[in-house]
Amino acid sequence: MNIEKMKENKTTEELLEFGIINIDKPSNPTSFDISDFVRKKLGVKKTGHFGTLDPKVTGVLPIALNRACKLTVFFLGEDKEYIGIMKIHDEVSVEEVERAISEKFLGKIKQTPPKKSRVKRQEREREVKKFEIVEKNGNDFVFLADVQGGTYIRKLVSDLGDYMKTGAHMLELRRIRAGIFNENGSVNLYDFEKAVDEYKSGNDKELRKMIIPA
């Protein structure tokens, strides 16, 4: 798929009517906050986001514009990839953590959504394609995870701690990929806002670069 070729045949207004902007979500705002900010800044009727990120979680948050909002349902089950830091509450080696992961937390797993989640707390099956330890610093472990959409990483970390009988919790998390969208193609809010201001002043060059035709 040649996105640039697709863009050539569309006006900026057509892209805004049926396009997607891959936002690099900062920490603290909710996913809805980001979606609403994009809507108000662009002056479009409707926006929606592909896969919710907790307020403290950063990274890839594709925002659908107007008619593209109908596509969000098709992206919910897409694989997601994360990099994060977890703290294990006891002294353990990388090898011990990797052993526990390989025994219980790769492939098809059972997971119950956390208490704070908005979905029904019912056990469900999810697939973990990758859960790797990248680095260790004291009791803090940097990890990479590639999972089926709808997998709760915070719960994955907590369940790992329970399984090891050490306890564990997540310190930081960043989504680096959501389906076909990755962080290399994401746009921070400062650059987005600047591009919209330029568009409103008659220069749509930077904004066009940011919109992916749906």
Predicted segments with their positions:
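Non-catalytic RNA-recognition surface used by pseudouridine synthases
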Residues: 1-58, 64-212
